[in-house]
UniProtKB/Swiss-Prot annotation:
InterPro entries given in the database record: P-loop_NTPase, Small_GTPase
GO molecular function term, any single one: GTPase activity
Keyword annotations from UniProtKB, A to Z: Cell membrane, GTP-binding, Lipoprotein, Membrane, Nucleotide-binding, Prenylation
Entry membrane topology: Lipid-anchor
Entry's localization field: Cell membrane
One Pfam family per UniProt: Ras
Source organism (scientific name): Dictyostelium discoideum (Social amoeba)
Main location: membrane
PROSITE patterns reported for this sequence: RAB
Name of the molecule in the record: Ras-related protein RabK2
Lineage: Eukaryota, Amoebozoa, Evosea, Eumycetozoa, Dictyostelia
Positions that bind GTP: N11, T12, H13, G14, S15, T63, K64, S65, D66
GO cellular component entries: late endosome; lysosome; phagocytic vesicle; plasma membrane
Amino acid sequence: MDNNNNKKLFNTHGSAFDDSKIYFRDVDCGVLCFNIHNEQSFNNLNHWMSLFNENVPFVLIGTKSDIERTEKSISKERIEQWCKQIEDQGIVKEKIHYFETSAKLSTNIIEAYETIVKIALNQYKNKQKNSINISIEPEKPKGICWW
C-alpha cells in the first residue's frame, strides 16, 4: 500500500458544490456538519446524505456546542434518533460517529478529526485490499540496432 495518500476536506458552505455528486465520488469518509441551534441546518442533513454513494462511512458533527441549548435547539435524543434511522435504513454501512463541537472552546475538534482520519484510512486500506493492480510493462525492442 502507498503510505503517501492524500486526504482532502471540502467545506461546501451549502452552496458551491450543492448537488454536485462529482465532488463526493469515491470518498473514504463523509463528514456532515450542522448547527445544533438551527432547525434548517439539521433538516438539510438528509439532502447532503443523499449526495454520497451508498455505504460511505460518516461522521456527524453538531457545531456551536458552547452555546446553551434552548427549546429551539436540536436535542441530543433527536440527533440520536436521526442517526439510528439512517443506520436502520442501511444507508450507511457502519455506525455514524457523532461529535458536538465548539470552535470557540476547541471542544471535540481533535477527537472528531482523529476519528475522521482513522475511518478514512481504514476505508482506503479496505479499497486497496479489494482492488486488482494491473500493470503492463512496455516490451523492449528485439533485434533492432540503434546507432
